[in-house]
Amino acid sequence: MAGGITEFLLKHTGLCPVSFHMPGHKGSELYRRLGYGDFLEHIMDCDITEIPGADNLFQTEGIIRETQEKYQNLYGVKKSYLLINGTSGGLIAGILASVEPGGSLILARNCHKAVFNALTLGNIKPVYAYPEEEARYGIAGVTTADEIDRLMREHPEARAVVLPSPNYYGICSDIAGIAETVHSHDGILIVDQAHGAHLKFMKDQPAAAEDCGADIIVDSIHKTLASFTQSAVLHVNSERISLPVLEDQLQKIESTSPSYLLMASLDLNGDIMREHGTSLFTQWQENLDVFYREAEKIPGLRMLQPADLQGGSMDQTKIDLDMSALGLSGARLEQELIKRDIFCELTTGNILMCMTGIGNTQADYEKLLAALQEIAEQESRGDRMVQDVPRDAEKPKHTKLSENPAKSKIPWNKKRPLQDT
């Protein structure tokens, strides 16, 4: 009898849960519906290593190169690289290939943990760009081209810039404007597009960084599209990047035992984009349009919308829910949805973020709508905003260094406040 991790996973799948968290495929139904069930049936037999004919991730000549060229054509870039260490590995390699050891890097203050790890590995000096704040929710908004221009003028030694867009909440910076600014200073722009691999294919969402002049773009294909968790793609989009230097860094960062299951899922995702992309993305957008229209009718429910932003644009495949008017924090709302077997991605203060993906069905959105309506009806109608705990009241009189001062304290992915009692 399996225990631990396996037992948990089997128990969870037995709930027939609705997934509004990564990965984007949302389970096996998408693969089976599109005719890829045979791969799932033989998945254990496909777990191999670099046998003859299987190519080599770090010296591609055959089937892996073909898949990389598939992505190169799909995204319209100069070169694409498969990643089996996620976008994290791609960001680290891209930064180390763009900044000399001991050099300086301009980075948005809300960058992913991987960027800070790259600073350590490359002995790189950070120059922080501060995003605008979305004051209502206390979350990071856009990083502006003016902020990047100011920093590049003040720090001419910093020749590379990295920032996330979309960020975790779906807020997108003006990548075209930032790229123009960075290139006017003869710099390199690296975009962490972990949350935006779908933007290239959805005309009603913000423009993809691949179409906005970024030099390196890293896409977490698994987050919103159809590949397996931990699979991603790095795109090189200009002549400013030395491919041999980048490839050398990728070899240093990535595992020497790359998973053929992850790479195969990237291959299948590429096929899905080419053969079924138009219909899938059209249905995805239609489902979102219906959801937002119907959700606006639910009393006490707010959603972060493009009109709410201080600047930039909004990737509305991230549904940011707020029921604080009914006395529910994001964490409380999450627990109410879990009771109904609906699992979401992220809570921050009053926000509960539902990450939609290419595998979500119309029924998923209908179940979420029904659950939100039910929750709204069971809660009081009073305007009881959830307040943050005053920081001064919670601050200890005496502070001390961590018991392990060498360990970074960087939040990423699941950022959860204290649970409500």
Mark where each language-model region is.
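N-terminal glycine-rich, Lys/His-bearing helix-loop that initiates the first secondary-structure elements
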Residues: 1-43
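Conserved PLP-enzyme active-site core in the AAT-like
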Residues: 6-10, 74-77, 87-305, 323
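Short glycine-rich or small-residue beta-strand-to-loop segments that form or flank ligand, phosphate
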Residues: 54, 81-83, 161-164, 352-355
